[in-house]
C-alpha cells in the first residue's frame, strides 16, 4: 500500500521585506526536500498549496514555523492517495490576492491586517446560513460556485474574483443595511474582500475563518448545508465537504446528468471548463461545440492519437463532420 500524501493549504498576511529574494530562497528549500506545489509570495504575505509525503510536509511546516514571521501560520491539512501537484513553483507577485482595486479605479488596495471582516467559526457561520436576515455571499469564481456552494448563498453574476467589487457596488442597495457574510476556499480572498466591504461602508460584515476547507473538517458542523464539492486549484480539482448529507449539484455539459468531473475544452483557443463524464468526453472528443470538436488543434485528438478516420467517425456518430481543411 502506497504512503499517504498530505496536502497543505495555507496563507498569512504579514509584511515580508525583500520578498523577491525570500521567494527564491523558499523555492530552493522546497526543491531540496522534494516538495510539490504552488506558492505565491508578495510584500503583503504568503499564500500556497503544497503536497508531499508525511516526512516531507512535516519538514516544510517545521521550516516555515521556524521563521518568527510565520510561527503561528495555520496549515490546513488533507490526506490523499496521490500527489496533488507535479512540479514546484514559488513565484513573487505584487499581491498574494489580486482584487483589482487599483486597476478598476477603486482607490488603494486593502491591508487585511488593518481592515477586515469579523471572523466566524464554522458553528457561527452555519448559524448565519440559517438566518433569514443574513446575506451569504460567495466570493469565488463562477466555475467554483457551479461545482459546489453553501445552500442559499448568492452567486454574483461575475466570471472571476476581480469583478466582484464592481458587482457589489452595482447591487449595493440590495444588502447595504443587512448583515453580510462572505466565504471562499481557504479564507485568503475573504480577508481582503471583507475589508473592502467595511471600507465601502457596510456596517456588519463577517467572514468564514479558514474558509470552506475548515468548515468541512469541523467535527461539529461536518460540512452540513454545503451542496456539491469544493473546487481546488490542483490536480484533485474537487474535494468533498459535506459529510452529513452529500449531494451532487453540477450537471454534465452534454446530457445534463449529475457530474462533478471538470475538463477543459480541447480547443486550445477556447479552453472552457465544462463538466463531462469520461464517456461523454470520448463521445464528443472533449469539445464544447461543433467548432471546437472539429478544430484542427483539438487536444483530445492529439493526446489520444486519433487518426483522421477515427476522428471523423466520432463526429459522424453525433451528426457532425470534419471540414476539408483539417489535416490527418
Swiss-Prot record:
Residues 130-224 form the Rhodanese domain. InterPro entries: Rhodanese-like_dom (IPR001763), Rhodanese-like_dom_sf (IPR036873), Rhodanese_C (IPR022111), TrhO (IPR020936), TRHO_N (IPR040503). The keyword Mitochondrion does not apply. It catalyses: uridine(34) in tRNA + AH2 + O2 = 5-hydroxyuridine(34) in tRNA + A + H2O. Keywords: Oxidoreductase, tRNA processing. The active site is at 184 (cysteine persulfide intermediate). It comes from the Bacteria. Belongs to the TrhO family. This is tRNA uridine(34) hydroxylase. It comes from Streptococcus pyogenes serotype M1. The gene is trhO.
